[in-house]
Amino acid sequence: DIEPIIKSVVDDFNNIYKLKRWIQISYVNDKKNKYFINGIENRIEQIVANLLDNAVSFSEDNKEVIVKVSKSKDNKVIINVQDEGEGFKEKDTNKIFKRFYSNRPDKFGQHSGLGLNIVKNLVDLHNATIKASNRINQKGASIEIIFPIP
């Protein structure tokens, strides 16, 4: 069950950013289901942590980041991280997963451009897929990982 792994990372980030920048990170499991995948626990933690770090980095103070877990119609497990930041400027969002690529504005500080590349490599390791898009009808970005059925 990946829920305890995700909740642990969300709690860690809330402990840091709730007081530091008043950013609320919410975990959503609408169906209250258990979600099982074949995966390496510390790598799943790293995926979620890197996605949250990226989402928080692009978020203004007093905003929300949402981590949602669900199942697709064909029972694949989906982890979706959404922020209320500026969204993606790139038409081809696959660019953001390239090594050393960064579109981070200076006001958000410098980063190596490796975080999302590491996520992509770990997602590939789990035979999963990842896609990035701008949120529909509101400001922000959405990154979705779809894990195969165990």
Per-segment meaning from a language model:
Residues G115, V119:
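Short alpha-helical Gxxx[C/S/T] motif in the catalytic ATP-binding
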